[in-house]
Amino acid sequence: MREIVHVQGGQCGNQIGAKFWEVISDEHGVEPTGAYHGDSDLQLERINVYYNEATGGRYVPRAVLMDLEPGTMDSVRAGPFGQLFRPDNFVFGQTGAGNNWAKGHYTEGAELIDSVLDVVRKEAEGCDCLQGFQITHSLGGGTGSGMGTLLISKIREEYPDRIMETFSVFPSPKVSDTVVEPYNATLSVHQLVENADEVMVIDNEALYDICFRTLKLTTPTYGDLNHLVSACISGVTACLRFPGQLNSDLRKLAVNLIPFPRLHFFMIGFAPLTSRGSQQYRALTVPELTQQMFDAKNMMSASDPRHGRYLTASAMFRGRMSTKEVDEQMLNVQNKNSSYFVEWIPNNIKSSVCDIPPKGLKMSSTFVGNSTAIQEMFKRVAEQFTAMFRRKAFLHWYTGEGMDEMEFTEAESNMNDLVSEYQQYQDATAEEEGEMDEEEGAME
């Protein structure tokens, strides 16, 4: 029941995805060969959320891997869990998108998309009751952003009533891999606003900061960053996979977190984040988890929640704990920091509790927040976009693939609209809301 089909696209998406499957397989006791060697029936009870049981008791991930060049996929296949995946589920081209959104969305990607959709369809048909899709990709490159958003819109057409959740790595303010990131990201956001249900915003710089500051890693690798992300992905779906006292699923998350359909870009956080060696010496309490989870330093996107207000938030706890304590802490957070929550949505934190903690921890919590501060992120990308677009820099790479300048202008204004929508609700107060309704009534 409640299966999730996982799609990973592009280099970044495949690397995050590969790490994620290591984490999930560890939680469910699945060996790299696909055999089950766990120690508890609970690991098997709902293992079919992410795995198909194949002949001979092997567990095969419901994962689709796509890329426009074979490189990253080869390294996934050669990685520790490479033999876990179904060989037919690797779909790749040979040319690469060359960091060009237009190649991923219109030319190279469009040629490959049908074979990806075939695999997605096959996975979806193997499900009892499909909950939705989760996609890991980055918005700065060509494949993850261009082809990723193309796939999202195609899946949207075919499965309009299923939840579409993406884990999207946004370009970082200080760390840039490619010059044309602002173009690719803006064009992608334009698509994600329309076609995704929930977008978890991740940012390499914020992840680096967590590794440096909190985890005390002097030279964090992408592996370390991806490990943080996969802890979050695992936390978001823990309630689907293990029994809990208060369940949540992707749809409940969407209903509780999205007050207005376009505002579905979330910050995520995870607690406890302790450096690898020192973990086992501390017992964590629910108040400590709560405090750490709402801390700005724990956010995996480089926007500071203290610069905006939370429209809604969701806290998912894992481990043995009293639900009463969880509820008290959630109320406590809202009362103490009431200025950081909009007052026209009372009780705007959803909490859920899952009994089984992740490997190596007694308790953990995952935070998903819909904060107006996320606009900082879009503003930053929009400024960089405008700076280049004013001079039409690098545009020929996109127009050469058949794109029109109009599309850039549209994407830019859509992004600016998004920013002003967030700003509008950040400034709104409970009193104004009533007045606004009256005015609208008068206008009619």
UniProtKB/Swiss-Prot annotation:
* CDD domains xref list: beta_tubulin
Record GO terms (molecular function)? GTP binding; GTPase activity; metal ion binding; structural constituent of cytoskeleton
Q: Which domain of life is it from?
A: Eukaryota
Q: List the keywords (alphabetical).
A: Cytoplasm, Cytoskeleton, GTP-binding, Magnesium, Metal-binding, Microtubule, Nucleotide-binding
Q: Which InterPro entries match?
A: Beta-tubulin_BS, Beta_tubulin, Tub_FtsZ_C, Tubulin, Tubulin/FtsZ-like_C, Tubulin/FtsZ_2-layer-sand-dom, Tubulin/FtsZ_GTPase_sf, Tubulin_C
From the Swiss-Prot or TrEMBL record, state where the protein is found.
Answer: Cytoplasm, Cytoskeleton
Amino acids binding GTP = 11, 69, 138, 142-144, 204, 226
* Names of required cofactors: Mg(2+)
Record Pfam families:
Tubulin, Tubulin_C
Where does this chain mainly localize? cytoplasm
Covalent S-S links between cysteines: none
Q: Which GO terms describe its cellular component?
A: cytoplasm; microtubule
Write out the residues that bind Mg(2+): 69
Single biological process term from Gene Ontology = microtubule-based process
According to its UniProt entry, the function of this protein is described as:
Tubulin is the major constituent of microtubules, a cylinder consisting of laterally associated linear protofilaments composed of alpha- and beta-tubulin heterodimers. Microtubules grow by the addition of GTP-tubulin dimers to the microtubule end, where a stabilizing cap forms. Below the cap, tubulin dimers are in GDP-bound state, owing to GTPase activity of alpha-tubulin.
Its subunit composition reads:
Dimer of alpha and beta chains. A typical microtubule is a hollow water-filled tube with an outer diameter of 25 nm and an inner diameter of 15 nM. Alpha-beta heterodimers associate head-to-tail to form protofilaments running lengthwise along the microtubule wall with the beta-tubulin subunit facing the microtubule plus end conferring a structural polarity. Microtubules usually have 13 protofilaments but different protofilament numbers can be found in some organisms and specialized cells.
Family membership, please give it: Belongs to the tubulin family.
What name is this protein filed under?
Tubulin beta chain
